[in-house]
UniProtKB/Swiss-Prot annotation:
Record protein name field: Acetyl-CoA acetyltransferase
Function: Catalyzes the condensation of two molecules of acetyl-CoA to produce acetoacetyl-CoA.
An annotated Gene Ontology molecular function: acetyl-CoA C-acetyltransferase activity
Substrates-to-products reaction catalysed: 2 acetyl-CoA = acetoacetyl-CoA + CoA
Domain of life: Bacteria
Active site (record annotation): 88 (acyl-thioester intermediate)
Keywords carried by this UniProt record: Acyltransferase, Cytoplasm, Transferase
Record's subcellular location: Cytoplasm
S-S bridge residues: none
EC main group: transferase
Assembly and interaction partners: Homotetramer.
Database matches in PANTHER family: ACETYL-COA ACETYLTRANSFERASE, CYTOSOLIC (PTHR18919:SF107), ACETYL-COA C-ACYLTRANSFERASE (PTHR18919)
InterPro entries: Thiolase-like, Thiolase_N
């Protein structure tokens, strides 16, 4: 089995719907967070094999915002990306999808 790691994570600032970030698209916010996660991990974008994103309210942003964000963060076009949108559980489902692919954590 291939070893899989989560090297880093970052999130955007928290705001209210229609608030300070209303003119910034979710894709732009995601690119900022992805670039920061890559920077914190001290890796290069080409080292990332796959991107998963849990997102909500993605209508009007185009297809597969995970892919748009990955490309915006410099991850090569050859690397796959998947958006999961099931409202509040999106982040958890993203984690579950990753765990299903990699198997249970070993101690």
């Amino acid at each position: 089995m291939r070893e899989v790691v989560i090297a880093s994570a970052a999130r955007t600032a928290v705001g209210s719907f229609g608030g300070a970030f209303k003119s910034v698209s979710a894709v732009e916010l995601g690119v900022t967070a992805a670039k920061e996660a890559i920077k914190r991990a001290n890796i290069t974008p080409d080292m990332i094999d796959e991107s998963l994103l849990g997102g909500v309210l993605t209508a009007g942003l185009g297809q597969n915002i995970a892919r748009q964000i990955a490309l915006g963060a410099g991850i090569p076009v050859e690397k796959p990306a998947m958006t999961i949108n099931i409202v509040c559980g999106s982040g958890l489902r993203s984690w579950r999808a990753l765990r299903t692919r990699t198997g249970p954590r070993r101690r």
